[in-house]
Amino acid sequence: MSGKKSGLPDGRVPDRNPDGTPAVPWKSRWTEGPLPLWLVATAGGMAVMFVVGLFFYGSYVGVGSA
């Protein structure tokens, strides 16, 4: 974030200003800071499905295919 002083005890920047406007512009949310949780979960889910798919593929070809 951009050098804002925090009033919160753990040092976080508040999500909203006192007037209700967002403290960080929407564009900055995509270019600074951690990745959104939905993006991490989607990538992780796709990776898990890929690995499980490899196991199923391996059961039909190769050593375990009878």
From Swiss-Prot:
Protein's name in the database: Photosystem II reaction center protein J
Q: What does this protein do?
A: One of the components of the core complex of photosystem II (PSII). PSII is a light-driven water:plastoquinone oxidoreductase that uses light energy to abstract electrons from H(2)O, generating O(2) and a proton gradient subsequently used for ATP formation. It consists of a core antenna complex that captures photons, and an electron transfer chain that converts photonic excitation into a charge separation.
Q: Which UniProt keywords apply?
A: Membrane, Photosynthesis, Photosystem II, Reaction center, Thylakoid, Transmembrane, Transmembrane helix
Tell me, how does this one assemble? PSII is composed of 1 copy each of membrane proteins PsbA, PsbB, PsbC, PsbD, PsbE, PsbF, PsbH, PsbI, PsbJ, PsbK, PsbL, PsbM, PsbT, PsbX, PsbY, PsbZ, Psb30/Ycf12, peripheral proteins PsbO, CyanoQ (PsbQ), PsbU, PsbV and a large number of cofactors. It forms dimeric complexes.
Q: Per UniProt, what is the membrane topology?
A: Single-pass membrane protein
**Which residues fall in a coiled-coil region?**
none
Please, one GO biological process term?
photosynthesis
- Protein source organism: Synechococcus sp. (strain RCC307)
Task: Tell me yes or no: is Chaperone among this UniProt entry's keywords.
Answer: no
Provide an example Pfam family for this protein.
Answer: PsbJ
Question: Which HAMAP family does UniProt cross-reference here?
Answer: PSII_PsbJ
Gene (UniProt): psbJ
Q: Where are the transmembrane segments?
A: 37-57
Q: Where in the cell is it found?
A: Cellular thylakoid membrane
According to its UniProt record, which protein family does this protein belong to? Belongs to the PsbJ family.
Q: Among its keywords, does the record have Thylakoid?
A: yes
NCBIfam families per UniProt:
PRK02565.1
Which residues lie within the region annotated Disordered?
Answer: 1-27
Q: Which GO terms describe its cellular component?
A: photosystem II reaction center; plasma membrane-derived thylakoid membrane
Q: Please list which residues make up the signal peptide.
A: none
